[in-house]
UniProtKB/Swiss-Prot annotation:
Modified residues (Phosphoserine): 2, 59, 98, 144, 210
Sequence segments annotated as region (Disordered): 1-21, 53-72, 85-133, 179-236
Quaternary organization: Identified in the spliceosome C complex. Found in the Intron Large (IL) complex, a post-mRNA release spliceosomal complex containing the excised intron, U2, U5 and U6 snRNPs, and splicing factors. Interacts with TUFT1. Interacts with DHX15; indicative for a recruitment of DHX15 to the IL complex. Interacts with GCFC2.
Organism per entry: Macaca fascicularis (Crab-eating macaque)
Full protein name: Tuftelin-interacting protein 11
Taxonomic placement: Eukaryota, Metazoa, Chordata, Craniata, Vertebrata
GO cellular component, one term: spliceosomal complex
Keyword tags: Biomineralization, Cytoplasm, mRNA processing, mRNA splicing, Nucleus, Phosphoprotein, Spliceosome
Amino acid sequence: MSLSHLYRDGEGRIDDDDDERENFEITDWDLQNEFNPNRQRHWQTKEEATYGVWAERDSDDERPSFGGKRARDYSAPVNFISAGLKKGAAEEAELEDSDDEERPVKQDDFPKDFGPRKLKTGGNFKPSQKGFAGGTKSFMDFGSWERHTKGIGQKLLQKMGYVPGRGLGKNAQGIINPIEAKQRKGKGAVGAYGSERTTQSMQDFPVVDSEEEAEEEFQKGLSQWRKDPSGSKKKPKYSYKTVEELKAKGRISKKLTAPQKELSQVKVIDMTGREQKVYYSYSQISHKHNVPDDGLPLQSQQLPQSGKEAKAPGFALPELEHNLQLLIDLTEQEIIQNDRQLQYERDMVVNLFHELEKMTEVLDHEERVISNLSKVLEMVEECERRMQPDCSNPLTLDECARIFETLQDKYYEEYRMSDRVDLAVAIVYPLMKEYFKEWDPLKDCTYGTEIISKWKSLLENDQLLSHGGQDLSADAFHRLIWEVWMPFVRNIVTQWQPRNCDPMVDFLDSWVHIIPVWILDNILDQLIFPKLQKEVENWNPLTDTVPIHSWIHPWLPLMQARLEPLYSPIRSKLSSALQKWHPSDSSAKLILQPWKDVFTPGSWEAFMVKNIVPKLGMCLGELVINPHQQHMDAFYWVIDWEGMISVSSLVGLLEKHFFPKWLQVLCSWLSNSPNYEEITKWYLGWKSMFSDQVLAHPSVKDKFNEALDIMNRAVSSNVGAYMQPGARENIAYLTHTERRKDFQYEATRERREAENMAQRGIGVAASSVPMNFKDLIETKAEEHNIVFMPVIGKRHEGKQLYTFGRIVIYIDRGVVFVQGEKTWVPTSLQSLIDMAK
């Protein structure tokens, strides 16, 4: 029996020194490494099979290589091993699988070169000194000298704010416990004995390194291709992806999607690799790196290994892995696309459901429209049948209105969209003409207003009304009024007399809110105004007994500015009639007074100045002033025109024709030893003849003040003063009283004007509007650049004194008093401004 199989290596080969032969028996190793491209090619020699571990090795074996064997250390003691049977392939595979798992590695597994060599005399030699692998002393007594010092370091740290038990740093972010060291079990390199992390490191940094995780996953995946060495059937761990996870991811790979049509037939030459490759679409380029290149050298796929003898890595099937991964990706993309298609179909169902509802609503609406149109057509045909002459039950206007009301209320949409013009022309117009056949508008102006108002709401086009149009072809009501109602009005206007205006005015007032605006304008412009213009041309103010305003003014609310062309001939005729007029004739005032508010202010003032004021001046010039026997008729004739002529024109007449004679008579009277009481009464009597508006005029005020000055000078002179005791005081009191009244009136008027300006928002801003007379004076001073300020420490009768420019004044109950030569004199605000300038 051959014992060669006892010395056969794991590869099933027996090597000799000169010749080598290979046993052709199939072993487990052959089956396992059948597809392994990285299996070892070394054959066992005959010497190795004979002498076993005592076989001499060639120098080639001792050179550095990527293998897991190491050179023997002959300085180490001799360790005898039993000459047992060589392990079979299955047992060796079990050992290799067990090596893949993490296990504590013994120190003997590594070369002795990692630690310092020690002299050993035998297998049982024991060193006399125990220590750590590096030959260093124990760290147990490190820093023991600190126990014999005074702890200056601790004290310095405490002075700098260190709190025992807390970390260093401003925010105590330093570590509290010192870094914990872990003693390595043997003399191997770092990582040879597994993880060297301490308990403190696991607590402070619980996160596992990503490289360690990747290595663990790789080892687990690699071990799935090998048989479990323990013989137990361990279930492999699989990573599953649920459909929900794929839906959440929801991304479709661009590599797996169908290429675009325009890029699917493009020829591409790839020269980036070792050899030229031709692709027939861009989509193929995206897949070129998924399949590994064939023929890669074995050395490029092997990683250098050091340490113990490396075992053969598990063989890889990249094509199989690629195909499996491609199937997985295609399945995932199919799931995602199916989910999207399902969602699309669901949305389409919802959309179609809504469209079905809309179409159902449209269908119902169309059915209702068809039904309504059928009913409307029946009603129209009924009206047409009853409009026939031989019908026993003819249609009346009220019944027709009710039919149209039914159409408008129940079938509004169809009625609004229908051609109401043609329908009204065919049905309503004949009935309306029959209704107004015997109508006289001037006798019964309200006839038909109710029925026309009803038809207005039925026939008028709201859209046309909002645009203000007058298209007869688009609005049935406008056409009805123009073709049916308007002919009756034309016939009446041709027979109407303009002087009898009331019936026509009442008629148009009754219909103004019913008929369209453009029809009313046509009536006024084309029918009424020509009749009035012709009648004005025939009017004679001297012979006609009926005043012209009695038949012109009633048209003002309706025609307004349309009557402007009539005013010029009316003024011309009135001016001709006033050429021989005398102010004693009051009829002229009665004729002209109604026109004052009709004519414009400019034209009215020009008419008065041209025709009335000269006549009044002549009358006032004929007035004789006699204190003993006064005739006031001429004065009354002139004053009676106040309000008709302007105040300025009236004051001009008084200044020219009245006050010179009046002052002359006063001077003559004072020079003849008069009775001052009679003069006072005469003065007050003439002053009472004028209105407050005339007295407030500065010219009239100056004339009366001049009369007071004449009276004061007369009583102040020695001549005749002794003849009447108390006359001087009476005249002075009269002067003071009159001037005070004038100034109070002036102040009140100015204050009222200031308040009106404030209310209208005209002038100064609201914040600067004067609230009292002092503020008004201050505002006027600012406007005229005049200094207005109080005099410090100066008062008169308890009133504060002020400087207004160069003048000293004080204010008492809304009246300004100016300091004169001997006394304080009241004055107006305008006079104060003039004196200050």
